Regions:
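Residues on the lipid-exposed face of transmembrane beta-strands in outer-membrane beta-barrel proteins
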Residues: 9-15, 48-54, 83-87, 134-138, ...
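Conserved C-terminal beta-signal and adjacent last beta-strands/turns
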Residues: 97, 217-307
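Outer-membrane beta-barrel signature, preferentially recognizing the C-terminal barrel domain
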Residues: 2, 101-155, 162-191, 222-227, ...
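Transmembrane beta-strands of outer-membrane beta-barrel proteins
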Residues: 20-26, 61-65, 95-97, 145-147, ...
Length: 307
């Protein structure tokens, strides 16, 4: 059994001036976990990000440099800069590009999970990466189309590996990973029976090239994501209520596609927002990259307040 909790505070602010628009954000969180498998764990996190958007040639060109600084009590301080560039070719047609560094700390599952086939590794190091992306966006009223291609180079990849077929799978930082991807997104708003609807359709294709490893058996190599298709539908039933569903179809290297359905209900009351979610409504049995089974049907209730 797992009991997890997260307590946090997030503050975001934007400032506009004759020099452009600045953004600042702070996120502080405490994460706690009690598990009969992972043990009792705690993690403190602090995130600070700063960015500034410059406009040139009558807002036809935008350049947005930024940096994020992250602290985890068990992994220390790290920073990862990035930059976005956009160019409006003609009205409603824009090309963009971005590049930046990414950073992912090991999860409690990566560090401490144990079962009859798998063990974690408390000595794992964070994954790091560098991503480059170029894309184009077309807007016509409420109809938006976005197409993009990206390349990601990751190091210290966390993978589950073993030397012999009879060994247990163990988490290790073992390889470099180069990923090429294509993304497409179509979304629009429309009305049916005086109710506001919003639909989003997205598709992602990924091609991974795993660096040479001295270990012959790799979970990532046999279970990396290849195709990911998502449909999102939201309906506003008035000023206060919104319902939504998300249907996800995924196919991995091992060739076992699966579908996951999530439902949500939002109720807005003044500055308060209450959200109820049912994830994996159909209790689909599936695993993510690390082959650890994901939860069956489960619920989440969140409360938010706007200052």
């Amino acid at each position: 059994m797992h009991i997890s909790n997260k307590t946090g505070l997030a503050i975001d602010a934007t400032f506009s001036s004759s020099f452009g628009k600045s953004g600042l954000g702070i996120d502080v969180a405490h994460i706690g976990l009690k598990s009969n498998n992972l043990g009792t764990r705690k993690r403190q996190q602090f995130l600070l990000f700063v960015e500034h958007q410059f406009w040139f040639y009558n807002h036809q060109i935008s350049v947005t440099p930024g940096i994020a600084v992250n602290y985890f009590n068990d992994f220390g301080w790290h920073n990862f800069p990035g930059m976005d560039v956009g160019l409006e070719i003609v009205p409603n047609l824009r090309i963009y590009g971005n590049l930046g560094y990414t950073y992912r700390v090991p999860t409690f599952t990566d560090l401490f999970y144990q079962d009859r086939t798998t063990i974690g590794n408390k000595n794992l190091e964070p994954e790091t990466g560098f991503t480059k992306e170029i894309g184009v966006q077309m807007t016509r009223g409420k109809f938006i189309v976005n197409l993009a291609a990206f390349d990601r180079q990751a190091s210290n990849l966390i993978d589950y590996v073993k030397e012999k077929e009879t060994d247990l799978w163990q988490a290790n930082n073992i390889a470099l990973l180069n990923t090429f991807g294509l993304e497409g997104l179509v979304k629009t708003d429309y009305r049916i029976f005086q109710k506001q609807h919003r639909i989003e359709i997205a598709y992602t294709y990924l091609k991974d090239e795993l660096g040479q490893s001295t270990l012959p058996f790799s979970r990532y190599a046999i279970n990396s994501l290849k195709h990911h298709f998502i449909i999102k539908q939201f309906i506003e039933w008035g000023a206060q209520f919104t319902t939504g569903f998300v249907l996800k179809h995924a196919e991995r290297t091992q060739g076992n596609p699966y579908q996951v359905l999530d439902l949500s209900l939002d109720w807005r009351f003044g500055k308060w927002t209450f959200r109820g979610q049912i994830n994996n409504l159909l209790s689909t049995r599936y695993s993510e990259t690390n082959l650890v089974p994901m939860p069956l049907a489960n619920g989440l209730l969140t409360v938010g307040y706007d200052f």
